[in-house]
């Protein structure tokens, strides 16, 4: 599993980092960034909560890895 954060939608509310600091941080521009680490079973709950708390729905959890570039990692 991996987390993808849509930088075009992110408004820098910080709910993702407040909810799951193990998975998210904020960049110099104030927008959310996904930390480069796997989403372990222990982190899946906080990841889902971050998805729910994002006010602009900029975060999603993908079960399969896609090719290409994204702001998220994992």
UniProtKB/Swiss-Prot annotation:
[3Fe-4S] cluster binds at residues 10, 16, 54. Keywords: 3Fe-4S, Antibiotic biosynthesis, Electron transport, Iron, Iron-sulfur, Metal-binding, Transport. Pathway: Antibiotic biosynthesis; mycinamicin biosynthesis. Binds 1 [3Fe-4S] cluster. It comes from the Bacteria. InterPro entries: 3Fe4S_ferredoxin (IPR001080), 4Fe4S_Fe-S-bd (IPR017896), Fe-S_cluster_ET (IPR051269). This is Ferredoxin MycCII. It comes from Micromonospora griseorubida. The gene is mycCII.
């Amino acid at each position: 599993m991996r987390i993808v954060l849509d930088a075009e939608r992110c408004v820098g509310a910080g709910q993702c980092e407040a909810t799951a600091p193990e998975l998210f941080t904020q960049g110099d521009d104030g927008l959310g960034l996904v930390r480069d680490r796997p989403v372990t079973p222990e982190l899946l709950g906080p990841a889902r909560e971050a998805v729910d708390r994002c006010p602009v729905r900029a975060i999603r959890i993908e079960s399969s890895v896609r090719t290409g570039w994204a702001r998220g990692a994992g």
